[in-house]
């Protein structure tokens, strides 16, 4: 728990909050515009709007965010030469990795909440009058967080092996795009980068 708290403290005053705040706004905007442009087909109000939001966020923006979170935590140790300090402590490498994993999962969870907030705001702005499906939103976000956790574990490993900040983020973006293909072919449950979309 102490290790996890240490990792969570690294998010304070971190530049990743800019990505956290602004990146989800774009898929929310694109998804809402796409929904408004296809009202004759998308008639299930809140559910249809959610599908359009997640279409853009799960395959393009969320994988990039997970990549940024993971790369940031790992790159921070390289940048400040912290690995030697870590390894001199009476803790295992597995404990260090798990602490970083849970810290990343924490950010993914908050990102899901922010996406839900943007979704509800978008629905209200365009005048959806049906009741907001709060229970379904909770389920979608919970499973989305779990799917994001699988992606985060891979991204943390990639960020551990590649000292470049950008390369793992690029791999995450490519993984998100490939997730669209795997999900379309019915193999979304087998591909780590499709699990977030599969859950949401």
Regions found by a protein language model. Give the residues of each.
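Hydrophobic alpha-helical interface/terminus motif in multipass membrane transporters
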Residues: 74, 83-86, 118, 122, ...
């Amino acid at each position: 728990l102490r290790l996890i708290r240490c990792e969570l403290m690294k998010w304070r005053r971190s530049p990743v909050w800019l990505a956290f705040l602004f990146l989800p706004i774009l898929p929310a905007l694109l998804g809402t515009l796409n929904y408004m442009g296809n009202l004759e087909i998308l008639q299930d109000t809140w559910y249809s709007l959610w599908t359009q939001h997640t279409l853009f966020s799960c395959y393009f923006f969320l994988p990039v965010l997970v990549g940024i979170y993971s790369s940031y935590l790992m790159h921070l140790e390289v940048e400040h030469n912290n690995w030697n300090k870590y390894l001199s402590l009476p803790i295992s490498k597995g404990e260090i990795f798990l602490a970083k994993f849970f810290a990343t999962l924490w950010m993914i969870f908050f990102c899901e909440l922010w996406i839900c907030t943007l979704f509800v705001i978008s629905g209200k702005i365009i005048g959806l009058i049906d009741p907001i499906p709060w229970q379904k939103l909770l389920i979608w976000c919970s499973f989305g967080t779990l799917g994001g956790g699988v992606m985060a574990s891979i991204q943390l490993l990639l960020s551990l092996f590649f000292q470049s900040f950008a390369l793992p983020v690029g791999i995450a973006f490519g993984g998100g795009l490939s997730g669209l293909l795997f999900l379309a072919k019915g193999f979304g449950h087998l591909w780590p980068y499709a699990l977030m979309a599969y859950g949401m």
